[in-house]
């Protein structure tokens, strides 16, 4: 049985060490996901995201720091499908995604701050 945690409970428990003040939106079909976190810094360039998600991601979540840029998308449908094929649980992006109509039907957790059609 999986134990559920609410965001406010986690924030209360770890208030000394949490400093995220970003409003993420869900873009994928999976609303809940968890796993070991792998990080990547990718300001306005998704090549590293593509490279990482092309590898086995069993039980992992990719956390991408795109510096909050809304100039380009760091994830689209093709890279998201690749992530699913490689067993990733989800992707959290401090930046934008594209192909939102397709992303919302893919069985992948995807959170980002917005969408942008430019790659």
Q: In which residue ranges do the predicted regions lie?
A:
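Feature captures the catalytic cores and cofactor-binding loops of soluble hydro-lyases/lyases
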Residues: 2-119
């Amino acid at each position: 049985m999986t134990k559920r945690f609410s965001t406010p409970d986690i924030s209360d428990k770890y208030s000394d060490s949490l400093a995220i003040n970003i409003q993420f939106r869900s873009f994928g079909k999976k609303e809940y996901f968890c796993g070991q976190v792998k990080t990547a810094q990718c300001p306005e360039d998704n090549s590293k995201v593509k490279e990482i998600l092309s590898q086995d991601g069993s039980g992992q979540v990719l956390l991408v720091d795109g510096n909050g840029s809304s100039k380009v998308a760091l994830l689209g449908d093709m890279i998201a499908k690749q992530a699913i094929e490689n067993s990733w649980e989800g992707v959290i992006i401090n930046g934008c995604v594209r192909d939102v109509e397709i992303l919302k039907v893919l069985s992948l957790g995807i959170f980002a701050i917005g969408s942008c059609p430019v790659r």
